[in-house]
Amino acid sequence: MIYPLLLSALPLLSSAALTYRGADISSLLIEEDAGISYKNLNGETQALEDILVNNGVNSIRQRVWVDPSDGSYDLDYNLKLAKRVQAAGMSIYLDLHLSDTWADPSDQTTPTGWSTTDIDTLTWQLYNYTLDVCNTFAENDIDIEIVSIGNEISSGLLWPLGKTSNYDNIAKLLHSGAWGVKDSNQATTPKIMIHLDNGWDWEEQEYFYKTVLATGSLLSTDFDLMGVSYYPFYNSEATLSALQTSLTNMQSNYDKSVVVVETNWPVSCPDPEYSFPSDLSSIPFSAAGQEEFLEKLAEVVEGVTDGLGIYYWEPAWVDNAALGSSCADNLMVDIDTDEVLESVTVFEDL
């Protein structure tokens, strides 16, 4: 049995202990087109990527949609964003949704024009897609650090063929997508990630990986990283101690590095739909609370063997401050002034 460590007993971290101190700023170009100009802590207008890198962020996550109706988050959109990210000196992590729209546990719609009836055809389409994405980035002299084959795929991917009613299909798809990345012309092969939701729920993580690897169609050598989402405002059981147990078990059972790839903490949450986890209940809903939460989360991740990093999800999406939650504001930007909050400095110490 693996016993969760007492959080209070975790050692203090040295500066910049995590490999990836990241943020997902996928909506940046859309926000700028809407007229938003971000301001640094001195109140001066500055490009968001420069504000972030100056405060310790070293990696940016970007969601990629296949063929969205309005071009949002498509390949061209992400090339524009990635060029700015790379120029600012940060690494790039592509979160491939493998859909024309949002992909998450409730919806994994196959892109228009991809097969929904033949798994062999679909695996080749996925292989060619991940190959093309990586090669297009290479042609534009953009290096990719991480590629996630799907987004929050605990319920499968590329439905209906990739539903959890057929884990062998899921395994074939993950294998095919991974090899498109491996066969690409990227100067250094990007790290390949599988990303599930509810990172605090070890039973959910264990069932998925045990089942998909048991098919034999996905090999442990096909991927490098296990990514998880960890949101404290959707379930009172999502404690830091539960997360630590889950990440520890994931790493020790599968010998993979682990990353928390989505997380948030609110500056305003007057009417939460769910109770917050017990070991987080003392943290205030404020910029100071964001710092405290991320510091505690970093302690958990750093305390796990091969715990590599944290990515804060959409800290500057001013037009969507709730970020899909019941909390009013989870941003690191003041929604009235577009100036970043003091909490942005926490990345320097993670």
From Swiss-Prot:
Signal peptide start and end residues: 1-16
Functional pH dependence: Optimum pH is between 4.0 and 4.5.
Keyword terms: Carbohydrate metabolism, Cell wall biogenesis/degradation, Glycoprotein, Glycosidase, Hydrolase, Polysaccharide degradation, Secreted, Signal
Keyword Iron annotated: no
GO molecular function annotation: arabinogalactan endo-1,4-beta-galactosidase activity; glucosidase activity
Enzyme class of the recorded protein, top EC level: hydrolase
Induction text: Specifically expressed on arabinose and galacturonic acid.
InterPro entries: Glyco_hydro_53, Glycoside_hydrolase_SF
Catalytic activity: The enzyme specifically hydrolyzes (1->4)-beta-D-galactosidic linkages in type I arabinogalactans
Listed SUPFAM superfamilies: (Trans)glycosidases
EC number: 3.2.1.89
GO cellular component: extracellular region
Any Gene Ontology biological process: pectin catabolic process
Transmembrane regions listed in the UniProt entry: none
Glycosylation sites recorded in the entry for this protein: 128
Positions annotated as active site in the UniProt record: 152 (proton donor), 262 (nucleophile)
Compartments, record wording: Secreted
Annotated family: Belongs to the glycosyl hydrolase 53 family.
Function noted in UniProt: Endogalactanase involved in the degradation of plant cell wall polysaccharides, and more particularly of hairy regions of pectin.
Protein name: Arabinogalactan endo-beta-1,4-galactanase A
Gene from which this protein is expressed: galA
